[in-house]
Amino acid sequence: MNFARDVVDAADPSALALVERARDGRRREWRFAEVAEGAARLAGWMRARGVGRGDVVMTLVGNRPEWVMAMVACFRLGAVVLPCPEQLRPTDLARSVGVVSPTLVLADPRNRATLEAAALGCPVAYVDESGLFDGPDVAEAVTLRPLDPCLLTFTSGTAGEPKAVLHGQRYLAGQAVQAEHWLAPARGDLVWCTAASGWSKSARNVFIAPWLRGAAALLHDARFDPAARLELVERERVAVLCMAPTEYRVIAARVPLRAAPALRGLVSAGEALNPEVLRIWQQATGLPIRDGYGQTETGQLTGMPAGGEIRPGSMGRALPGTRLWIEDGELVADPATVPTFFLGYLGADGGGEAPGGPWRTGDRVREDADGFLFFEGRTDDVIISAGYRIGPFEVESALVEHPAVAEAAVVAAPDAERGSVVRAVVVLRSGFTGTPELARELQEHTKAATAPYKYPRVVEWADELPKTASGKVRRAVLRDSG
């Protein structure tokens, strides 16, 4: 098996693969023949520089065709690709390199300053360099097995450093299940998954799942603008729109909604959507938002099927063939029935193979009489904000590096648009006073120390943090007090 050969090379060469809408307004259509050739030549270029089967290639490129071709080139060689979000700071990138030891980094030139500050100590190439996508060498696709590694994605833990989740080739082929039963594009459709490159949802839904169904993918490399988002859906005749819950909420609150002639499907995943947002979108477009659920480690587990019964607020039922159950309020999965289940973790916070036996998701879920599942929250301390999963340890570590901070604890606070935001409870050192100016200073300090989406939008002061007898912070007390 090889995704590059079996899907990209095997497609109709003249069929539409990508529609590129660049930041500068440029528009270009990419046929499968162009994508296949560009990826094959990039694979040849990488092979000549020592990249081979099992080697790690890190990408720091936005939602551009160059990112897609870099992914396909890695699949072609049997290399393992780690797509990184462009929001990462130098410290984040350096930490990632320390965990995965990449053979090569492929980057957008706009990220040059970040990479130079990170001083990664490994080869870096920029996607605008001559010869990467039009060089003389073409690499043939190697034959791979389902458990051969292909993809890495970092996930935030509740303590310690983030872990790198390693997926096998089966992860790519396994997307066929959710592509058919949840995303559900038809052959020739245009699908727009707005997830930024580097996030687990982007790896599967920006182009992999659409291509498995014979659909094309829209790539829009620009910041989120609610009005521009709707205009582009109409202009490009998007058939299936996949957005984060926060994006649906913001658009519903800020832009007059209207039906788009070609739009047939709205899907979302990452956190629950409130009933009012669901109502506004359905009333304006005539379409329900079909929710789904998955994790970095598992891929998609549930979904509201196209054409099936819609249960507002539900994340659907288990995908066909996937066995799920609830144990003490927690959703549990049988890995043997999950075709996209991960191979294991890399990193100091949990190396080795995936744990055997049932997979405990750490998510509290309830099930109604008809088998529809409803998300109720996390059993651990991970914060889900605007679809981002944020581990409190990283934010706390950044805060305590500030000279004014003696201790800090981070929990989730409810937010109408983002679902949750990061709330920091801070104990100051002697001589410092909690003021709005200091709160803003701590926010800017955190943005500089780690990825900016992790900064605490709420900063509160406390004389001390609630702790257990052994000295552990009682986060549940802080959550309840918020």
Region roles according to the model:
Residues 317-321, 328-355, 390:
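Conserved ATP/PPi-binding loop(s) of AMP-dependent carboxylate-activating enzymes
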Residues 29-33, 150-174:
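Conserved AMP-binding A3 loop
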Residues 18-64, 68-72, 89-94, 98, ...:
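Conserved AMP-binding/adenylate-forming core of the ANL superfamily
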Residues 173-193, 197-240, 254:
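Conserved AMP-binding/adenylation subdomain of ANL enzymes
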Residues 13-16, 137-154, 161, 184-190:
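Conserved pre-ATP/AMP-binding loop-to-beta segment of ANL
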Residues 238-243, 252-310, 323:
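Gly/Ser/Thr-rich phosphate-binding loop
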Residues 7, 48-49, 72, 76-134, ...:
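Structural core segment of the AMP-binding/adenylate-forming
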